[in-house]
């Protein structure tokens, strides 16, 4: 009888441990948005950093990118309480140091409209979700930004060439403009202007 009781206690303990383990594995927080990723020597994303500076170790192999490279990404990830990240999808953003507007040739100064879906400053970047109306998935557009250099304020502008494409549905592009190197202080203002479909955009954002 005593032996039977011990076996039952052990069985209950094992079942409880397994149940707790299973419950812990299910505790994940889904996140979709901008993050910074570092690839390893094989091109897999190894570490992600959110816009608050928190680091997450990537727990599974991802799509391959350029090895040993820092990427600004839009990701869909599952984050757990041990700071591990399981990457579901990762899309590189359009991200580069903005050239001075004065060096852009006139042939590239096309301002077809775009739609700003969302915009905010975070992680040291000006992050923008851009909507572009296209005819189909294979439509080819050009989209880039510059920094105006004939002004005493930090102002960016977009150029978009639709090459005469028809407006059928909206396709998204993600942009992260690096803000380091401009000597910005807390509460400085960052400006962005571009042509919109219904009205033009003129944003003033506070650097924090």
Regions found by a protein language model. Give the residues of each.
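First exposed extracellular module after export/assembly in secreted or surface-exposed proteins
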Residues: 29-208
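Bacterial signal peptide processing site
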Residues: 20-24
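Sec-dependent N-terminal signal peptides
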Residues: 6-14
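C-terminal motif of bacterial Sec signal peptides marking the signal peptidase cleavage site
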Residues: 15-19
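Positively charged n-region of N-terminal signal peptides that target proteins for export
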Residues: 1-5
């Amino acid at each position: 009888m005593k032996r039977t009781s011990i076996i039952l206690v052990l069985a209950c303990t094992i079942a409880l441990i397994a149940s707790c383990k299973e419950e812990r594995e299910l505790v994940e927080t889904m996140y979709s948005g901008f993050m910074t990723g570092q690839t390893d020597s094989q091109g897999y994303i190894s570490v992600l950093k959110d816009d608050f500076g928190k680091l997450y170790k990537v727990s599974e192999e991802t799509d391959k990118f350029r090895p040993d490279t820092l990427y600004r990404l839009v990701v869909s990830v599952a984050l757990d309480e041990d700071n591990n990240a399981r990457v579901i999808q990762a899309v590189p953003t359009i991200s580069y140091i903005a050239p001075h507007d004065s060096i852009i040739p006139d042939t590239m100064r096309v301002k077809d409209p775009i739609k700003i879906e969302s915009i905010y400053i975070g992680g040291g970047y000006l992050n923008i979700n851009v909507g572009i109306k296209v005819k189909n998935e294979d439509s080819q557009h050009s989209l880039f930004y510059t920094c105006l250099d004939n002004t005493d304020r930090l102002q960016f502008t977009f150029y978009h060439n639709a090459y005469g494409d028809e407006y059928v549905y909206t396709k998204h592009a993600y942009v992260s403009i690096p803000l380091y190197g401009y000597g910005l202080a807390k509460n400085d203002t960052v400006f962005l202007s571009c042509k919109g479909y219904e009205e033009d955009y003129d944003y003033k954002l506070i650097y924090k």
